[in-house]
């Protein structure tokens, strides 16, 4: 069995029918505001690790706490939330740990570029320290919008140094 796959949020993952392929991995990692419902054929349903950026998790959106039960009802095998950031935690992670029923990992990285790195980039860095081989799907380094909707401004990837991230990954 393949060990680990990281599912990116770019729309280039659609219409490829990768759902079964993805679900056959031992570790399936998704991040931030990923969606499963209506995308099962292309994205599968398995999620063993959910990577979130620190801000999404700790600001007023409280995304992890507010969405954990929904995510657990739509996916299989969720065992861990991984919060990745270049920001310093000021006690927020411990507060969140008391509110949820899965394991949380918090990892802070030194900023690799002048601008904020994407959560996907930080996830790749984190996972490569754990798995010697990492399969990536759904990454196009800012060429498309998120797969789950192209209609709202919040669906457009933020300002990141896509070229630098792509060069680092290549």
List the predicted regions and their residue ranges.
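Metal-ion/cofactor- or nucleotide/acyl-coenzyme-handling active-site neighborhoods
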Residues: 1-170
């Amino acid at each position: 069995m393949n060990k680990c796959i990281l599912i990116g949020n770019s729309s280039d993952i659609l219409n490829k029918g990768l759902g079964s392929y993805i679900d056959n991995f031992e570790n399936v990692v998704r991040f931030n505001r990923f969606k499963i419902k209506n995308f099962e054929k292309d994205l599968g349903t398995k999620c063993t690790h959910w990577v979130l950026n620190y801000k999404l998790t700790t600001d007023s959106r409280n995304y992890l706490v507010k969405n954990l039960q929904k995510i657990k009802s739509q996916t299989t095998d969720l065992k861990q939330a991984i919060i990745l950031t270049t920001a310093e935690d000021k006690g927020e992670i411990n507060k969140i740990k008391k509110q949820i029923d899965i394991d949380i990992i918090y990892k802070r990285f030194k900023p690799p570029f002048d601008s904020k790195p994407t959560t996907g980039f930080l996830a790749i860095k984190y996972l490569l320290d754990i798995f010697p081989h990492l399969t990536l799907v759904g990454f196009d380094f800012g060429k498309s919008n998120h797969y789950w909707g192209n209609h709202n401004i919040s669906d457009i990837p933020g300002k990141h140094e896509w070229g630098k991230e792509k060069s680092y990954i290549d």
